[in-house]
């Protein structure tokens, strides 16, 4: 009796609910069968070739319902590589692993056997024995009509396509025109190789050849979706940064499955315009000079191809939800981004580019074309950094052009819609804003930048040396490494990677050090400073607004700065000054110290330590096990509205009130004595007692440090938590 060598067991699966996918499954649950999976890994399936080593028909005897025929014989050695590749095409996309074994005299054969049989009618190429529990060891076996013996089974042949089709049956796929019928217009091999209908152009004669090519060389979009529904996806296939490059000399129908990396669909070799889409489950149409192929390059569902390159023709390229880089190259191209932060570069020609959602960047100004840029939603940028001459950009008018007649030929004349940011050239540019919040990068050269309305920002982040910029100056100013710039109606600045000097004006400014040890002075107004270097210096005058430092390093507020917010992911600390400070932590473990003044400390995430300091402070721990720490003299008044406040004490989070630095007995002079917690009991004129009293729905912590039976400090806890001794560090 013939024996399997690996799997041999069959399971079942349910319909997906998708009409396209379910058209490849039997409507009868008894025939909706698959090879049983292996725990914790891919489904292991073996295959073999009948009689390859001359073993006789004993493998038919006792084997069950294999075809009764006068002749069975094996494929040739020259045909095996193509058949192996057909099996691999399915293993590339599905979580199955095919292992080829050699049949032997002991009767060991694969789960799937492949061979020729005279029982197959000459009207058919071959057939596959349907896999089911009732079929016995014959299920999944593929028998080929003997007239195919001259075939090579290589890609671009009908035999290769037919073998992939039969292997699809062996994996459990049905025809899309039987039972659950695929929606109209999709019953052809562009969409599923389980169809009998060939797409236009699939029967192709290469110029100078008399040998026909069949251009479908992979399972297609719905085949991949269906087989992945049954077995799962192969998430190890093509996880690097792959380039899928196509050429006009070889037409093809193909679907791309790629499991990871940053990948590119490349049609740069084409001179005729192509339609390229990166949206999963859709098709691109490549244009060939000698044949018409409609929707010939598919991208499988669940597959993300990030980038696309066009050719020298007028291409239409559409992105997906990832951060795409779409390059039109030559021709009058139409580029459309998706939901991600995309980069669009039309190349030469008069291009039409739309960013879609996300913060998109349009590369412009290199070829003199008349391009159209529509940013859509998000913060979108037109970049003239590679322009060959100066540019004038007017975001109110929505135009960009060369600054003189001679320059237009180098820069072009462009149309801008929904663009909020401009990067200038290396020349003397004029950049004019809109009524909105615009961002400008003048670059090298002596630039004129007018923000007009809104809150506008000039970035010097690309400067090749330190810059000195003063927003209070109205004329041309020598910035140093970035030339003589004239800034009008600009509110915010970002420095370079060097040691800059940034000065604000009488408005509310944002000064961003970016990198380097910078000196920043905001002037009047409520200013915001971004600090990331221990060498950064912030200068503020008295009564010059209420100012904020956003810091990526541990920082102590200097004079006349009121507020501090810690940013980034590092465990850093923030310390206030003598003013009423608002100090916010980040998501890590922070130590926040208010010092003098009526401060508010907010820990955010992490296990934070909050130290209010003198005067009346408000402390908000946020998430995590926070510690509210007090020392002698750190308390406010002896009333609900004047004492220190803990806003969100949570025993569940692990919060503690730390009084270990407070001397519980100030009269004995022996040092730092610990408190004794007495619950809600009244003081008994013993120094060092700590009690909790609920007043107006608030838990009030009271301490007697001199033994007079009266509270010497109050701490208010909102929400009336039932405080116990374990909630304190005494």
Q: Over which residues does each language-model region extend?
A:
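Extracellular, beta-strand-rich repeat scaffolds characterized by small/acidic residue-biased motifs
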Residues: 260, 269-271, 280, 309-314, ...
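Short, surface-exposed beta-strand/loop micro-motifs that present aromatic residues
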Residues: 33-36, 182-183, 254-256, 449, ...
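Calcium-coordinating acidic loop motifs
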Residues: 264, 308, 422, 493, ...
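Acidic glycine/aspartate-rich repeat arrays in secreted/surface proteins
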Residues: 105-115, 174-190, 197, 203, ...
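GD-rich hexapeptide-repeat beta-solenoids
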Residues: 44-50, 54-55, 184-206, 210, ...
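Zinc-dependent metalloendopeptidases
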Residues: 1-264, 268-309, 362
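Short amphipathic beta-strand/extended segments with alternating polar/hydrophobic composition
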Residues: 36, 57-61, 274-278, 409-418, ...
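Short, ordered beta-strand-loop transition motifs
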Residues: 38-39, 104-106, 133-136, 248-249, ...
